[in-house]
Amino acid sequence: MKIALGVEYNGKRYFGWQRQEKVLSVQEELEKALSFVANEKIDLFCAGRTDSGVHGTGQVVHFETEVVRPERAWAFGTNANLPDDIAVKWAKTADDEFHARFSATARRYRYLIYTNPLRSAVLPEGVTHCHLPLDHEKMHEAGQFLLGENDFSSFRAAQCQSKTPWRNVHHLQVTRHGRYIVVDIQANAFVHHMVRNIVGSLMEVGSGRQPVEWMKWLLEQRNRKLAAPTAKPQGLYLVRVTYPERFGIPLSPLGPLFLPDELV
């Protein structure tokens, strides 16, 4: 039997999603809680392995078990055994063909930037602070050069293990909400650090240090060394994973925080 879960987490304390020796990971904490509920060892598969410090509001995972529990028990029982910065949002018995990673057709991220000359004392865990003013309209315009299927070598980490740098970006939207700028991007999949590398370069455009057309040039060069530094992790959220309707995977509100599903 396969069980799918929707998971939310604050990534500040964790060295990423993936289980690793001698460091704290979201996967390890969730597997420990599930194993307690199941009274057997549980191994998880996730839709997207987020990096150290990155958050998730729409992560999807699955596991296989012969243990029978009500869906409610998988959610509430697991939450009772999790730290406060990880939570199960829903639990569902999944089709035998379902796989959290390989059945996914799209991943969606949102990156939050707090634009203010002075930093905030209450926001640093969930946003990236930028003391410079940013032109979100120019950032949005520059982002449109990345739409469609392209070679994203210029925005790919050197340690990326993917066999190909080609990805298909479905949409990229940059909007302003008071002092906050939100970069909303969806693709079929992402190479390592792709979202944060894109955001870092968009911030160069937004600050006026680079022209809008620079993003098009960067994409064409296929050279990571020419792009901007990687944006910090704390502003990044995995907000949704999309699957074929036949699997019946629930869609939670995108968020994070106060953000509605539709940004204007």
Curated annotation (Swiss-Prot):
Its EC number is 5.4.99.12. GO terms for biological process: tRNA pseudouridine synthesis. Disulfide bonds: none annotated. Coiled coil: none annotated. Substrate binds at residue 109. The keyword tRNA processing applies. It catalyses: uridine(38/39/40) in tRNA = pseudouridine(38/39/40) in tRNA. Keywords: Isomerase, tRNA processing. The active site is at 51 (nucleophile). It comes from the Bacteria. GO terms for molecular function: RNA binding; tRNA pseudouridine(38-40) synthase activity. Formation of pseudouridine at positions 38, 39 and 40 in the anticodon stem and loop of transfer RNAs. HAMAP family: TruA (MF_00171). Homodimer. PANTHER family: PSEUDOURIDYLATE SYNTHASE, TRNA PSEUDOURIDINE SYNTHASE-LIKE 1. Belongs to the tRNA pseudouridine synthase TruA family. This is tRNA pseudouridine synthase A. It comes from Actinobacillus succinogenes (strain ATCC 55618 / DSM 22257 / CCUG 43843 / 130Z). The gene is truA.
